[in-house]
Curated annotation (Swiss-Prot):
One of its GO terms (biological process) is adenine catabolic process. SUPFAM superfamilies: Composite domain of metallo-dependent hydrolases, Metallo-dependent hydrolases. It comes from Agrobacterium fabrum (strain C58 / ATCC 33970). The gene is ade1. It catalyses: adenine + H2O + H(+) = hypoxanthine + NH4(+). This is Adenine deaminase 1. InterPro entries: Adenine_deam (IPR006679), Adenine_deam_C (IPR026912), Amidohydro-rel (IPR006680), Metal-dep_hydrolase_composite (IPR011059), Metal_Hydrolase (IPR032466). GO terms for molecular function: adenine deaminase activity. Its cofactor is Mn(2+). Coiled coil: none annotated. The lineage of its organism: Bacteria, Pseudomonadati, Pseudomonadota, Alphaproteobacteria, Hyphomicrobiales. Signal peptide: none annotated.
Length: 575
């Protein structure tokens, strides 16, 4: 080693020396992908080249390399691993270990998750479970600390996460700052609780959540240091936020589907300020369509330039979250690589995660993490009479479901009555909805009406109810609603479908009432059966279960329901 005068010398790591030697070709590389091309996301070129890998790092391109392990990928294209920049793993209905096994083969090598679903149920215990899991997965799972638990004062959650409970996690190696700051009114109006969290995380990444926020109010929100946004549902909204310095995370989940609406902004010019995310996506949709690869295929088929969408899937995403070691196929960059047939079809035939070939043998090396929250459903039993809605004067507020959106409209109808009770109006597709507190805190029970499910009979119930995850049930029959809600207690959480007094479909989600203990293949198959049971009730929604799950979310406009009652989100108040 050369001695540089005046500079303290430290021993070089053998890994660093190996990377240099293998990159220069003085030593055979640990692994070489031979005969293919890689997609250069800087120049937009497809470059014919070997790709040399040392450990977890690409060390050589644009050359002819020898390797201890050589893989022929002739005719294939290599792209950087995909980064899902905002998701709730709980919405996949499987544990982080099963999510890893389910999604990594599709080329998603990094996932930036907000575990605020389990955090709303279990608090710090839920965060710790995710961090412990992230240390064991093959995929690089990064965790943002849930910023709004509970999301609002308008619902009952199972736990809270004040700043004092977040600070011990702040410097964990898997933590990337503060998760989506949903309480944007609290930011704008300088709520002391919000201010304490924002102050504590200045200089770290703070994720945004500000649907439809615009003008001076948006300026104030961004002045707090918030930089990313996944709630844009129109190109105009996204452009305003890009102009004001935000990175837009284009979302395509199982319910929230914004990809087509945002395609006008997915251009080479704007791609440095774009990334991709799924937010909430279940195993059935992943199996049938894919994950981020589905978004890439769909965008290109609709006319988006490949360079723009592949940048958004990797290098631009990495830069948005300060992950400086990944996102390109280039020397010195992390060997998160996806081998595909064509840019257009984006079908992964091989995936490398940190230089490791992804296969069953690799997944078998992971250490298991014990599940938590196996007794979290503590709701009181309910009767059909608990779902009655007394007659009131004038029109009744009704949530209007928009297919493919989690935004619900605030509609008002003069509903039919039966004696002193307001009843469903099937002619106008209006049925009952209820939220039942399930954390054992107060036994709250609120009833209302929702339009747009298409149900003609029966009931659907869920313990997945964003964000506090109380029981949410929709239905035509009060008897079926009661049976569905009570069955959730028997199976320790999940989804239940009831038709004419009998359970026709269910899935148990005993981990905090949110996730299954079964392999994702079993969950996928069970969801397929559940969908059939829901469709038999007449629902016209492609994904009725996650649609139910978003009805209680009082941070998304315009009308929602919590265990405390109907919520006018625009006024941020109970009706």
């Amino acid at each position: 080693m050369a001695i540089i005068p005046g500079v303290e010398q430290k021993p070089m790591s053998s890994n660093l020396e190996s990377r240099i030697d293998q990159g220069t070709g003085r030593e055979p590389a640990d692994m070489v992908l031979k005969g293919g091309r890689f997609f250069d996301l800087v120049t937009g070129e497809l470059v014919a080249s070997d790709i040399a890998i040392c450990g977890d790092t690409v060390v050589g391109t644009c050359g002819d390399y020898k390797g201890r392990h050589e893989i022929d990928i002739s005719g294939k294209i290599v792209v950087p691993g995909f980064i899902d920049t905002h998701l709730h793993i709980e919405s996949s209905l499987v544990t982080p270990h099963e999510f890893d096994r389910c999604v990594l083969p599709y080329g998603v090598t990094t996932a930036i998750c907000d575990p605020h679903e389990i955090a709303n149920v279990l608090g710090a215990e839920g965060l710790q479970f995710f961090l412990d899991s992230a240390m064991e997965t093959i995929m690089d799972i990064r965790v943002q600390l849930s910023s709004c638990v509970p999301a609002t004062h308008l619902e009952t959650s199972g736990a809270d996460l004040p700043i004092e409970k977040l600070l011990p996690f702040r410097n964990h190696p898997k933590v990337i700052g503060l998760a989506e700051f949903m309480n944007f009114p609290g930011v704008i109006h300088k709520d002391p609780v919000c201010m304490a969290k924002l102050e504590a995380f200045q200089g770290q990444h703070i994720d945004g959540h500000a649907p439809l926020l615009s003008g001076a109010a948006l300026n104030g929100y961004l002045a707090a240091g918030i930089r990313t946004e996944h709630e844009c549902t129109s190109a105009a909204e996204a452009l305003e936020k890009i102009r004001k310095g935000m990175h837009i995370l284009v979302r395509e989940g199982s319910v929230s589907k914004d990809l087509h609406a945002l395609m006008p902004i997915i251009t080479e010019r704007l791609s440095p300020y774009l990334a991709l995310c799924t937010d909430d996506r279940n195993p059935l949709d992943i199996a049938e369509q894919g994950h981020l690869d589905y978004m890439i295929r769909t965008a290109i088929a609709s006319g988006v330039e490949p360079l723009a969408i592949y940048r958004a899937a990797s290098i631009s995403a990495a830069k948005a979250f300060g992950l400086r070691d990944r996102g390109l196929v280039a020397p010195g960059w992390r060997a998160d690589l996806v081998v595909i047939d064509t840019l257009q079809n984006c079908k992964a035939s091989m995936v490398l995660s940190g230089g490791r070939l992804v296969d069953d043998a690799l997944f078998a090396t992971r250490k298991p993490v014990a599940p938590v929250g196996l007794d979290s459903v503590k709701a009181r039993p309910v009767l059909a009479s608990h779902f009655g809605v007394p007659v009131t004067e004038g029109e009744t507020p009704v949530m209007g479901v928009l297919p493919g959106k989690i935004i619900t409209e605030h509609r008002r109808y003069k509903l039919p009555t039966d004696g002193n009770q307001t009843t469903v109006d099937l002619e106008n597709d209006i049925i009952k909805v209820a939220v039942i507190e399930r954390h054992g805190k107060n036994g709250n029970h609120a009833n209302g009406f929702v339009q747009g499910f298409g149900l003609k009979k029966g009931a659907i119930a869920s313990t997945v109810g964003h964000d506090s995850h109380n029981i949410c049930v929709v239905g035509v029959s009060e008897d079926d609603m009661a049976l569905a809600a009570n069955r959730l207690g028997d199976i320790k959480g999940g989804f239940v479908v009831v038709e004419d007094g009998r359970v026709t479909g269910e899935i148990a989600l005993p981990v905090a009432g949110l996730m299954s203990l079964e392999p994702y293949e079993t969950v996928r198959d069970t969801l397929h059966t559940l969908r059939k049971a829901a469709y038999a009730l007449g629902t016209t929604l492609e994904e009725p279960f996650l649609q139910v799950a978003f009805l209680p979310l009082p941070v998304i406009p315009h009308l929602k329901i919590s265990d405390m009652g109907m919520v006018d989100v625009d006024r941020f108040a109970l009706i």
